[in-house]
Structure formats: structure tokens, C-alpha cells
Amino acid sequence: MTVLRRGVRLGIDVGKARVGVARTDPDGLLAVPIETVARDAQSVTRIVAIAEEYSAMEILVGLPISLSGADTASTADARTFAGELATASGLPVRLVDERLSTVSAHAALRQSGRSQKKSRSIVDQVAAVVLLQQALDVERHSGNPAGWVVPPGQEPA
């Protein structure tokens, strides 16, 4: 097993109405939900404030791609949001494959006995936890950070 880089990471699940935010502990052992941020003109500013509050070393943004690996309707939106975060935060921002993270989040919430209506406010946070945990697992097993770095000031390809 490879030792992870030390430091808090934020996980971001970008949606049209809400953005789920999760974080790791400094040792990268555990991902936990933080909050659901309304998707509006202030969402990037709020996430940057959260990153500062937790002294995050990097931000991981879920990239919604289809099971076949093709872009989805939400892929360009996530890339644009990641670019805005990279510019505003000055932190490394990485796009990570989030296939099935929201499906896994819904399943976990159903198994915990929550109705879909009650889950709506936290499903984005849980999806952020899932994508962050997957990224930690990739780094732990490969020795390399998951995903692709987003250059600040540019929308990634």
C-alpha cells in the first residue's frame, strides 16, 4: 500500500441547482460531508471559503461522464466550474471520474432508511464523499493522484 500525500482534500459534486461539498481528514483516511451549497453566483466564493477554512491542499471536482466514457450533458458544466474554482482558489483543482457516484449516494441513503424527499438536501454531499473516497482509493493503490489537473484561468478540454 502506498502512503498518501498528507493534507485535506475537498470533494465537489457539481449539480445544476446544488453543489455537494465533502472533505478528507489530513491523513486521507476518511471522507466526510460538509455542506450543500446553492448553485448560484456565490457558489465558487463559498467553496473557496470552505477550502480556506479547512486549509485544503487541493480540490477534486467530479466529472460526470457516461459509463462508456463519453461526455454527458453535465460534463462541460463541471469542467467550467472546475476552471472557475482553480482561478478563484489558487489551489490545484483536479477533475475526477465520478461515474455512478450519485447512484451510489442514492443507494446508500435508501439503505439508511431515508426517503428520496428527505435525501434531496444531502445527496449531493454524499455523492461528494463517494467521489472523494474513490479518488483516495486510486491514489492509495496507484501512488498517483486521481484525475487531471485543471489549469487556472482556462477551461480544461
PLM regions with names:
Residues 1-12, 16-157:
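Phosphate- and other anionic-substrate recognition elements at nucleic-acid/protein interfaces
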